[in-house]
Amino acid sequence: MLGSTDLVLLGKVVATHGIRGQLSVVPFSGEFSTILSMQTVYLSGPDNRKESFEVDRAAVHRNRVLLTLKGFANINEVLHLVGRELFARRDQFPPLDEGEFYWCDLIGLSVTTSEGLSLGRIEEIIATGSNDVYVVRDGEREYLIPALEDIVVGVDLDKGIMTVSPTEGLLDL
């Protein structure tokens, strides 16, 4: 489980935007609000160390987030940041409503059926537009579990377990 100060990978700087030093970031989760709420972000350096940067402004532009970092005023000052991964501290994330979870909290959870059958662990999450899909692997098999209320019947982050009630045939694919 993540600690409150652990860094969480949120996206990647894929380009600059304009001439005033804005960075174009693709969020990995398809969710913009977390990045938009950050006051400080961390970018991976060439040696994989994380450098912290204060956020001046953040806005959504098409399917990306445009970040303006304090102290950078033109494109030439930020070109070296393109290609870096963007991280934030877990304790900076805005609170969620009951029953909502951040992807970083779900990755690694053990998944069992309501009958007690162990399916494996959540290894990745796919954003489909209508609902997320959890990719659960046990080493031999892979299950694609849609994130729907009637299928995901329980999540216990403290115990590290997600309980699912799969529809008929879901686990046969």
Curated annotation (Swiss-Prot):
<feature type="domain" description="PRC barrel">
    <location>
        <begin position="98"/>
        <end position="170"/>
    </location>
</feature>
<dbReference type="InterPro" id="IPR011033">
    <property type="entry name" value="PRC_barrel-like_sf"/>
</dbReference>
<dbReference type="InterPro" id="IPR036976">
    <property type="entry name" value="RimM_N_sf"/>
</dbReference>
<comment type="subunit">
    <text>Binds ribosomal protein uS19.</text>
</comment>
<dbReference type="GO" id="GO:0043022">
    <property type="term" value="F:ribosome binding"/>
</dbReference>
<dbReference type="Pfam" id="PF24986">
    <property type="entry name" value="PRC_RimM"/>
</dbReference>
<keyword id="KW-0963">Cytoplasm</keyword>
<dbReference type="GO" id="GO:0005840">
    <property type="term" value="C:ribosome"/>
</dbReference>
<dbReference type="GO" id="GO:0005737">
    <property type="term" value="C:cytoplasm"/>
</dbReference>
<comment type="similarity">
    <text>Belongs to the RimM family.</text>
</comment>
<dbReference type="GO" id="GO:0006364">
    <property type="term" value="P:rRNA processing"/>
</dbReference>
<dbReference type="InterPro" id="IPR056792">
    <property type="entry name" value="PRC_RimM"/>
</dbReference>
<keyword id="KW-0690">Ribosome biogenesis</keyword>
<dbReference type="InterPro" id="IPR011961">
    <property type="entry name" value="RimM"/>
</dbReference>
<comment type="function">
    <text>An accessory protein needed during the final step in the assembly of 30S ribosomal subunit, possibly for assembly of the head region. Essential for efficient processing of 16S rRNA. May be needed both before and after RbfA during the maturation of 16S rRNA. It has affinity for free ribosomal 30S subunits but not for 70S ribosomes.</text>
</comment>
<keyword id="KW-0698">rRNA processing</keyword>
<dbReference type="Pfam" id="PF01782">
    <property type="entry name" value="RimM"/>
</dbReference>
<dbReference type="InterPro" id="IPR002676">
    <property type="entry name" value="RimM_N"/>
</dbReference>
<dbReference type="GO" id="GO:0042274">
    <property type="term" value="P:ribosomal small subunit biogenesis"/>
</dbReference>
<dbReference type="InterPro" id="IPR009000">
    <property type="entry name" value="Transl_B-barrel_sf"/>
</dbReference>
<protein>
    <recommendedName>
        <fullName>Ribosome maturation factor RimM</fullName>
    </recommendedName>
</protein>
<keyword id="KW-0143">Chaperone</keyword>
